[in-house]
Structures are given as structure tokens and as C-alpha cells.
């Protein structure tokens, strides 16, 4: 186990460990990879990482640009997986040890064995069975939430919080937005309370962040909602450039801002 920043003492520390100990499998978080994405790519080339067979990433949504970058850099399977502290093991992933399946960047995969994952309407509890319909990710019993059986010896609070938040049915709520495509791959869109209401349009921050992160000069981004007298809320993005030298002048910064806005408008619409 390595405990520390992926850039200390330098941005090659992960890869030096892989080379020294002939590491075959790694597990980390997407943020650590995004930190490395900002560094000089030559660090990865200084070490022999041929022993590495796969990289697992979890703990937060893995955006498609980051997944694509690390996949290209390592040329090994990048295995996203989605779970919660309460569940104790993955809800969504690709169990390639049982059945080989194609990775889709941006998706943690399909429901693990034993999990009956549903996409449901937050207002009615109706199950959304069509492809790419956005709803709350819920799970039928008895498997969830795994190791968690109550909340501070308050059984009623446990049931009301986790099992009765979706109207009209007893269903474990992950409190995450998600969609499922036509092939059964799930995409997690962020927390249900992490939503911006722009002129009556409910927008998930993760959707906006992933759109911005697709720009080649954006390494990291966070989106929050701020108050606006006209629209109620508007989205504000805080971004870290991959190459700050390209933003030395106000003209360059304005140009990047216009490019980012155009990217979001193209992918999500001008409302974002």
C-alpha cells in the first residue's frame, strides 16, 4: 500500500513502485489520475510498467477524458467500479474474471451479481426502463446495503432514510442520479442533492464537469451553483489548466473561456 500524493517526491513515484515491485494490479481514485494528467508525460516513460495488468479506479465518478488519458498512457484495462461505504462491495462494474466485457469510458459497467439495480423517477417511483432515461439509482432488497443494518440504533430512521425516500415503493436509494444505455451499461451522474436549478432546468453538476473536462487544456474542474436574480441559479466552473503557459494573457484566458462555453453548449445545450 502506498500512502501519499502521486506527485511526491515526483510525478513518477507510482510508476517507480510498479517497476521496483513488479506490481500487477493497482487501485486508486480518479482525482489522483487527474493530478497526474497535469504533469509532464515523460515521467511515465522513465519506468518499466509492463508488469501492470489492470488499474481499478473508484471512490468518485471517473470522467471519460481522464479514463481515456490513463488508458492511452498505460495500455492496460481501466476498470471503473461503483459502490458505497454502506454496501461494502461493488454495485456496478465489469466482472472480467467471470465474463469478458467491453469497457465503456464514463461507465462503471453493469450490475454485479446479486444486485437488482433500477433507474426510477424521483417523483413517482416509476421504474424507467428505456435507454438513457435519467433517474435515481435504486436497488431492490435483500442485498443492499450490505454491512449496514441500522443508523445509530434507530431502525426507523434507517428505513425512512434509505428505503422510503423513493415514493410508492420499498427500494434502497443510493441517492445518485444515473442512466442505463441500451446495452445495460450504467452511467452515474452525481448526487441527487448536487443539482443546479437554472431557470427551472435541473442540471447535474457532474454532467457539466465532464463536458468541460473534455477540452484538451482542462485537467480538473468543479462546478457549483451560484445565486442569480434572473435565473435563480447559474453554473460556475472552477477549472485547472493542463498547460498554464497557454493562459499567460487575458486574450488567451478569454479564448479558452469561449471554447469551454462552446463545448458545453454543444454537448448539453446553451441552458448550461
Question: What kind of feature is each model-predicted range?
Answer:
Residues 59, 83, 109, 176, ...:
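Active-site glycine-centered loops adjacent to acidic/histidine catalytic or metal-binding residues
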Residues 1-17, 202-208:
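ATP-dependent adenylate-forming carboxylate-activation enzymes
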Residues 110-114, 125-164, 201-203:
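Conserved ATP/PPi-binding loop(s) of AMP-dependent carboxylate-activating enzymes
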Residues 15-16, 23-28, 37-105, 116, ...:
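Gly/Ser/Thr-rich phosphate-binding loop
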Residues 118-141, 182-183, 247-257:
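Conserved beta-loop-beta connector loops within the AMP-binding
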Residues 19, 26, 144, 168-170, ...:
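AMP-binding/adenylate-forming catalytic core of the ANL superfamily
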Residues 51, 75, 114, 157, ...:
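Glycine-centered tight turns that cap/initiate beta-strands
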Residues 100-107, 161-166:
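Short, P/G- and charge-enriched loop/turn segments at secondary-structure junctions
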Amino acid at each position: 500500500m502506498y500512502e501519499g500524493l502521486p506527485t511526491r517526491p515526483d510525478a513518477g513515484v507510482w510508476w517507480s513502485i510498479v517497476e521496483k515491485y513488479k506490481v500487477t494490479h493497482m487501485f486508486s481514485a480518479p482525482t489522483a489520475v487527474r493530478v497526474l494528467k497535469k504533469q509532464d508525460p515523460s515521467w511515465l516513460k522513465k519506468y518499466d510498467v509492463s508488469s501492470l495488468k489492470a488499474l481499478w479506479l473508484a471512490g468518485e465518478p471517473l470522467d471519460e477524458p481522464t479514463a481515456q488519458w490513463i488508458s492511452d498512457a498505460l495500455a492496460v484495462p481501466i476498470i471503473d467500479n461503483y459502490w458505497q461505504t454502506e454496501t461494502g462491495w461493488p454495485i456496478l462494474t465489469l466482472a472480467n474474471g467471470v465474463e469478458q466485457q467491453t469497457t465503456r469510458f464514463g461507465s462503471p459497467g453493469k450490475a454485479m451479481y446479486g444486485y437488482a439495480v433500477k433507474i426510477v423517477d424521483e417523483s413517482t417511483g416509476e421504474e424507467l426502463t428505456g435507454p438513457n432515461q435519467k433517474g435515481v439509482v435504486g436497488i431492490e432488497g435483500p442485498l443492499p446495503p450490505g454491512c449496514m443494518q441500522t443508523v445509530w440504533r434507530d431502525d426507523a430512521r434507517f428505513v425512512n432514510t434509505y428505503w422510503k425516500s423513493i415514493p410508492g415503493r420499498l427500494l434502497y436509494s443510493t441517492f445518485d442520479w444515473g442512466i442505463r444505455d441500451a446495452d445495460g451499461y450504467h452511467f452515474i451522474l452525481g448526487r441527487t442533492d448536487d443539482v443546479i436549478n437554472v431557470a427551472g432546468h435541473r442540471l447535474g453538476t457532474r454532467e457539466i464537469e465532464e463536458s468541460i473536462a473534455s477540452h484538451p487544456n482542462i485537467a480538473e474542474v468543479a462546478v457549483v451553483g451560484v445565486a442569480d436574480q434572473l435565473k435563480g441559479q447559474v453554473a460556475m466552473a472552477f477549472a485547472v489548466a493542463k498547460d498554464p503557459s497557454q493562459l499567460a494573457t487575458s486574450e488567451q484566458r478569454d479564448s479558452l473561456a469561449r471554447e469551454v462555453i462552446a463545448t458545453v453548449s454543444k454537448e448539453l445545450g446553451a441552458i448550461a
